[in-house]
Regions:
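Parallel beta-helix/beta-solenoid
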Residues: 2, 10, 15, 20, ...
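Consensus "Asn ladder" position of solenoid repeat domains
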Residues: 3-5, 23, 28, 75, ...
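Extracellular beta-strand/beta-solenoid scaffold signature
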Residues: 4-17, 40-69, 84-90, 106-109, ...
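Acidic, glycine- and Ser/Thr-rich low-complexity intrinsically disordered tracts
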Residues: 5, 43-62, 209-338
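Proline-centered turn/helix-capping motifs that create local helix->coil transitions or kinks
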Residues: 33-41
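Long, low-complexity, polar and repeat-rich extracellular regions
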Residues: 204-205
Length: 338
């Protein structure tokens, strides 16, 4: 039940696990098949003429997965490097497993979860993929300490959450992606202490997502911090126990110097889903008219505009101030031990 220290080069499929419990896939290097030998068509070549074999590009959707699990329990996938596959690691009806310290690049989805519950993945790196990770129709997940970086393209994402509930995302770096995070039909999730920076869209918030709690996250350097479209986002909290998130803002009124801004932060999504059909509209993001609307929305909610409200936004000094507090150090230690 252990596969380790192997080099698996150019397979159509890498490692396949079916109804396996307690397996360990450790420290392997899996590089998928990117070309496929094909013969020229004898009809096109002409009767009596010799045909030739040539390599054709095997597009990502026609490749197999690097590691594929179906109907498994309690497996460990650790220390692997996976590239040039369809999905790096694919879970289907697989529960109570761990994915740790893997590096996955140049695939479709780095990590793809379907109908798989109570799994933990942490300290993995996902770069140069169509999506770093896609967690779909799953619950009770822990996503901790991962790097979703430079997943770029017209429809590229750092992290996709689709119809997934009661999960925890914490201390992840989500940077330089086309879309940092996407939430759609997701409920009762905790999003804590993640760095969502330098993405084209920081967080795309879809429909029917309620009861999600965002706190201590950093949303800075994103061209568009939030995209809500026509979705109602009032059912989620952007500050928990009086602690919100760090945003790009020019106004940081903190009279008592506790690291929490004294006025709420309202993030306005002016163009919403229009960006998908008309990308050039992004050039208006820093126009004087848009800046004026943002300024007005900070002071009073503009009816009919997509907006989220963080009741307790943070200053950059928040973490330094709280780190000096004994109560905060105790709370941080408890979070790390969860």
């Amino acid at each position: 039940r252990r596969n380790q220290n192997s080099i698996i080069a150019h397979p159509l499929h890498g490692v396949f696990l079916k109804k396996v419990s307690g397996a360990q896939i450790l420290n392997n290097r899996i590089q998928g098949k990117t070309t496929l030998a094909a013969s020229t068509d004898p009809v096109e070549k002409g009767i009596g003429q010799s045909t030739e074999n040539c390599d054709t590009t095997l597009v990502a959707n026609r490749r197999g997965n690097g590691i594929h699990q179906w109907n498994c329990e309690e497996n460990l996938i650790c220390g692997n490097e996976i590239s040039d596959a369809r999905d790096g690691i694919y879970f289907s009806f697989t529960n109570n497993s761990r994915v740790e310290n893997n590096s996955i690049h140049h695939v479709r989805y780095g990590l793809h979860y379907m109908y798989s519950d109570a799994n933990i993945f942490e300290n993995n790196t996902f770069t140069e993929n169509a999506a770093g990770a896609a967690i779909m129709f799953s619950k009770n997940m822990v996503v901790r300490g991962n790097r979703f970086v430079s997943n770029r393209g017209y429809r590229a994402y750092g992290l996709i959450f689709q119809s997934s509930d009661n999960s925890r995302l914490e201390q992840n770096e989500i940077s330089e992606n086309a879309v940092g995070m996407s939430f759609n039909q997701c409920n009762q999730n905790e999003v804590v202490a993640n760095r969502v920076t330098r993405n084209y869209i920081g967080l795309r918030f879809g429909s029917n997502s309620d009861g999600n709690r965002f706190t201590e996250n950093i949303f800075t350097g994103n061209l568009h911090p939030i995209e809500t479209g026509a979705s109602d986002v009032s059912g989620s909290l952007w500050a928990v126990h009086g602690v919100g998130n760090l945003w790009d803002t020019e106004h940081e009124l903190d009279l008592n110097r506790d690291g929490i801004v004294d006025l709420p932060h309202r993030e306005l999504d002016l163009f919403g889903i229009l960006r998908r059909d008309f990308p050039v509209i992004a050039f208006l993001s820093e126009s004087p008219a848009v800046k004026l609307l943002r300024f007005a929305n900070e002071r009073a909610v503009i009816p009919g505009m997509g907006s989220i409200e963080d009741a307790a936004p943070l200053t950059p000094q928040f973490w330094r101030i709280r780190a000096q507090s004994p109560n905060y150090r105790t709370r941080t230690a408890l979070l790390k031990n969860k």
